[in-house]
């Protein structure tokens, strides 16, 4: 009788959350997936930004996803948790900006609050229910602007269903606001690791150390917890040779795209990201991430 061998199960989840652009795949997730595959680590990519775009499309509000969100409206949408379940009180300036955004988008304030208080909690619950998070030992979030609260909120929920899972955060936001990494860890106990700088040089070694319950690798740019204290390996993770960055794997994006029935573009600016350089080409500006 022929023995059937079960395919290895990925133990790492790579996640991008709203409001990451829905017009194209995440180059961050694509690169990290390829890098982990080179190291023999299987991972699943989750494009929850696309799923959220799809949810907004159901209620005719998908145009706001690809809008330029003023006053960090995107962060406001996901701000109920982890901070509180309260609606909160806006100052007059912030509220007026929100009203202006609603008017320009052609939707009512009531609908904005419905997205925040009904659609998003249901969306987060569906993510938890549709995936077996107990199968993963590590979940990694790539952060940019407009993704902070969505990522924190989801990480908190995943930790609730699988307290043993380790959470790793990194991305463009941490490169600009390096002082925020330990502060986020101090405030949010569901964050286990923060990578400061480029992910390629450290991600596979870090995940292998987590899987083997070994000490944090002696590589720059890693914030971690030890005996209740937040520690760092010091420095910044830096990829000094772009040729060492692998070709991004966008398979998960297109599989999800097709499974949702999108046969045409979901936005007139749809694109395929490629990377030819990283950082400020003049060597001057810290916020430059192109």
Kindly label every feature range from the protein language model.
Residues 5-12, 134-137, 267-270:
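A short, charged/proline- and glycine-enriched loop
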Residues 5-16, 20-23, 56-63:
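Accessory recognition modules or surfaces
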Residues 11, 19-22, 28, 32-52, ...:
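Glycine-rich beta-alpha loop elements in corrinoid/cobalamin-binding modules
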Residues 23-24, 256:
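Short, solvent-exposed secondary-structure capping/transition elements
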Residues 44-125:
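Conserved N-terminal ligand/cofactor-binding loop architecture of enzyme catalytic domains
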Residues 56-58, 181, 235-236, 245, ...:
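Short aromatic-enriched loop/helix-cap "lid" or pocket-rim segments at secondary-structure transitions
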Residues 242-290:
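Radical SAM [4Fe-4S] cluster-binding motif and immediate context
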